[in-house]
Amino acid sequence: MSGVPLRVFRAAWVLPVAAPPLRDGAVLVGADGRIAAVGPRLSIEPPEGAEVVELGEAALIPGLVNVHAHPELALFRGGLEDLRFRDWILRLVGAKRAALTDADYDVAARWAMVESLRAGITTLAATEMSGASAGALREAGMRGIVFRETFGPDPAQAEDSVAELRTAVEALRRGESELVRVGISPHAPYTVSDRLFAAAAEYALAEGLPVAVHAAESAAEDHLVIRGDGDFAPGLRARGIQTPARGRSTVEMLDRLGVLRTRPLLIHCVRLDADDVLRLADAGAAVAHCPVANARLGHGVAPFPELREAGVRVGLGTDSVGSNNRTDLLEEARVASILHRAGRRSPDYLPAEELLRLCTLDGARALGLEDRIGSLEPGKDADLCAVSLAAPHARPVHDPLAALFHAARGTDVVLAAVRGRILYRDGRVLTLDAAALGEAVDAAAARLGGHLR
């Protein structure tokens, strides 16, 4: 990468993750987009010709890492409220088929990038069928992985589904770059047959593709996988698809089918037992923890403490705005802290410094990117986020970490940068036309609305 000016970012607080917080700190970014130095403001003299970016009463942190989102579903915010999970999915799928075009997905994905940048998210793992996020990430200048979904609950569909997946992935990979990668996502146990899971895993291993799977998310999924009944079973049987009682959990099933050999990112993982947790740890799998969406859909709370204690890589995800309504990783971290403190009956579980790690370096580890991003260290890419702590709801600041996660909001973000390139500053996304996108979103949503009831 070239063309990025030398920059010194200065802020009232610099929170490197890999080192203690710095009062009146600075980060020097080289022309290669990498961090050259981190230290007290007075110790970093701007090189000749360097641009100095003064951030004032802000906390400068690594760019936030959202390990699970559905950007193509940005038009569904507020349109799928108070539904049972099966009905939520059926209404979502029906509306997509009836109302949305490829152009709508392009608009939705770009709108999701606008929201993400405004919330300080610089890296995003997108799980979707359209693949629209690949172009949206590139245009926005963000970093990410696009997990292209595949579906097929009928075993007879497996070969055709894999062939279609290969074609789509090959097209997406032609646009890969240092910042944007492509993976695959056999969607979930209620939409993917055993045969398709196994074939997708073999394909991923052969091609070196990262894998993401929605897994152990709901009681309905549990009932289908273990007992062969529950909310999903009647619809599958009506299509002539058998729903055998496996007598094993989703994690056991994925292990038996070879999916865990891919060291996948498993999304949600609410319904795990102790054996499942150990199995994930042994396999080197990662988990996308989505506390807000899991709670709003009534699924419950993932066993995050047990996963961490077992050594499983866990990052935070916002899921779609159809299930969460907001793409705010600071809020996601705060909710995670509240839920798990309540569950553990412990007022000091997940302190603010661990929340910072959870939505930066831990997220990078979950996506296999920890050698490049997730902390402010010389040699790493300068993916940055600055959060103002000057608003009344954040002051006074006795502890910048506590202020960041227990008082500040995603709307307090004042800067987002990737490899030193500023993508968002003081209310304005610099790489996308937010005003035009907003008008396009409203027009598409008006057409979609009639299909959501």
Whereabouts are the PLM-identified features?
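Divalent metal-coordination and catalytic microenvironments
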Residues: 12, 27, 33, 57, ...
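Active-site microenvironment of metallo-dependent hydrolases
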Residues: 1-25, 30-36, 357-453
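Alpha-helical scaffold segments that flank or form the walls of functional sites
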Residues: 59, 77-141, 163-177, 440-451
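Histidine/acidic residue-rich metal-binding segments in metalloenzymes
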Residues: 135-136, 162-286, 298-314, 371
